[in-house]
Design a protein with these regions (language model features):
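Gram-positive cell-envelope targeting signals
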Residues: 1, 110-111
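Extreme N-terminal leader/activation tails
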Residues: 1-13, 19
Length: 111
């Protein structure tokens, strides 16, 4: 049995744990590369938003790690980012991720 077949046999819980791990890994990579400290509360907020967006993504097929990377990059550039996107529509955030539009939430705030 090859590794792909073994992966397909994982339980839903194990698959979820792998997704959460990939989200944490992306947050860690950005924080390390940007040399920033992110509080546990913000890490949890980014993780939860990334996971919710990943589950909500029906059309763009974005990976959980890609979503987490984008959100963490936005936070690294503007530490008020999470507050600013708290009430935004998920489709707007997903579209921004797909377009690599790191300033999308600024446009929303100006409206």
């Amino acid at each position: 049995m090859n590794s792909l077949e073994r992966y397909k046999m994982l339980s839903n819980e194990d698959k979820s744990n792998l997704t959460i791990y990939s989200i944490y890994d992306s947050i860690y990579d950005v924080a390390k590369n940007e040399d920033i400290n992110i509080s546990d509360d913000i890490v949890t907020d980014i993780k939860e938003l990334a996971y919710d967006l990943y589950l909500d993504d029906e059309y763009m097929n974005l990976s959980a790690s890609q979503i987490a990377f984008f959100l963490t990059e936005c936070y690294a550039k503007d530490n008020s980012f999470m507050d600013k996107v708290a009430d935004m529509d998920y489709s707007d955030i997903l579209q921004a991720i797909d377009n690599d539009n790191y300033d999308f939430y600024k446009d929303e705030m100006e409206r």
